[in-house]
Amino acid sequence: MDLINSTDYLINASTLVRNSTQFLAPASKMIIALSLYISSIIGTITNGLYLWVLRFKMKQTVNTLLFFHLILSYFISTMILPFMATSQLQDNHWNFGTALCKVFNGTLSLGMFTSVFFLSAIGLDRYLLTLHPVWSQQHRTPRWASSIVLGVWISAAALSIPYLIFRQTHHDRKGKVTCQNNYAVSTNWESKEMQALRQWIHVACFISRFLLGFLLPFFIIIFCYERVASKVKERSLFKSSKPFKVMMTAIISFFVCWMPYHIHQGLLLTTNQSLLLELTLILTVLTTSFNTIFSPTLYLFVGENFKKVFKKSILALFESTFSEDSSVERTQT
């Protein structure tokens, strides 16, 4: 999801401006920009509607609280995409200033980490609810979930601070301004010593981001849902296959949406093949930007309760506004 300048959406570790987008053909840039604009428009509308449903149309439970903040992380990201698309159409020229360069990069980093962490938290919640029902009955409360939510946001913010610090605007000799990472935090962009230091810090950031932002959460999700699926099948807790569909949706969507991003970031460190970088960049933009649209829809509609409540909520929006009795049926998942 790296789109800030050169589609460096969500904490670009190296600078796609230098390393990849300089190879992009105009058609590729247009594809990326259109993907961002479309994702922003549709994602803002759908995610905003989902947030409304979860906040005002459903009973506040652990489940709805976790999903609310998961979708909130998507919503925050979609609000910034138009700026990234505009920069892409302007050949990665950044005309929004250094402060917004830092804020956007930090915000997008925050959105990536929070979405990944909340997916893991939802998996752990399913695990505890299914395999430790007694403990869950005693401790699994909205207040407990609120502490989890707070911990996720604090952890994601802490991991995003380096990318807020490293991000700077750079003026080249032609007067072009780019928003890119300066890992050495030095104004001496050409020094070999500084370039070596930047490379070392870049590698360290990539490894930590890959481990904490993908590999570890992926294993947590796989472990939790595998255990849940085994227990559900063993006890025949559900006659429907819907719970298994939800589990598979979580695993597949996580892998499909985030694996291309980390592959592209790894390639930036190991290859200069322009075609390969271009293809992986486009794939990264498509999967991560549309992730903000389709992942919330999948999670809300695959689950039967979410689907029912969502349908009722659409019809009840105007009724709850204009009718004297504004109560709306709420369902607890």
Curated annotation (Swiss-Prot):
Q: Topology versus the membrane, per the UniProt entry?
A: Multi-pass membrane protein
Q: Which residues lie on this side of the membrane: Extracellular?
A: 1-30, 87-103, 166-209, 269-283
Its taxonomic placement starts with: Eukaryota, Metazoa, Chordata, Craniata, Vertebrata
UniProt entry tagged with the keyword Glycoprotein: yes
* UniProt protein name: Probable G-protein coupled receptor 33
Database matches in PANTHER family: CHEMOTACTIC RECEPTOR, G-PROTEIN COUPLED RECEPTOR 33-RELATED
A GO cellular component annotation here is: plasma membrane
Write down the SUPFAM superfamilies for this protein, in alphabetical order. Family A G protein-coupled receptor-like
Q: Tell me a GO biological process for this protein.
A: inflammatory response
> PROSITE patterns from the entry?
G_PROTEIN_RECEP_F1_2
Which domain of life, per UniProt? Answer: Eukaryota
Task: Report the GO molecular function annotations.
Answer: complement receptor activity; G protein-coupled receptor activity
State the compartments where it is located.
Cell membrane
